[in-house]
């Protein structure tokens, strides 16, 4: 398997899940840095969804002509064996917006 890269979208099998975690096999955005992706067996991803919610932790995205959101409130580490195949890469603008939103989420004021 190729190492997943930051800002790439991979189809990932997220089941089994518990409670309110986003479930099923779906596109996920890789948000962990490339250095970690090469060194570890796990990857940090944010699931993508076509169900839009007005949450500040959701980033709008158009990927492969489908509109949806990157669910940064659902980020998780998954084993690379859950990754099924690479689907592509988000735009530079979307990648920047995701990075800015993550900084806002984890910065203390």
Residue map of PLM features:
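Conserved functional hotspots at enzyme active or ligand-binding sites that engage polyanionic ligands
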Residues: 1-109
């Amino acid at each position: 398997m190729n190492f997943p890269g930051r800002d790439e979208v991979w189809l990932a099998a997220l089941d089994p899940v518990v409670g309110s975690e986003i479930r099923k096999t779906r596109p996920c955005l890789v948000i962990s840095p490339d250095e970690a992706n090469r060194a570890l067996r796990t990857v940090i991803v944010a699931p993508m969804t076509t169900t839009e919610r007005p949450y500040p932790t959701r980033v709008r995205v158009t990927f492969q002509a489908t509109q949806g959101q990157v669910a940064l409130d659902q980020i998780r580490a998954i084993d690379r064996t859950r990754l099924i195949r690479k689907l592509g890469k988000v735009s530079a603008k979307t990648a920047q917006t995701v990075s800015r939103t993550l900084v806002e989420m984890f910065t203390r004021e």
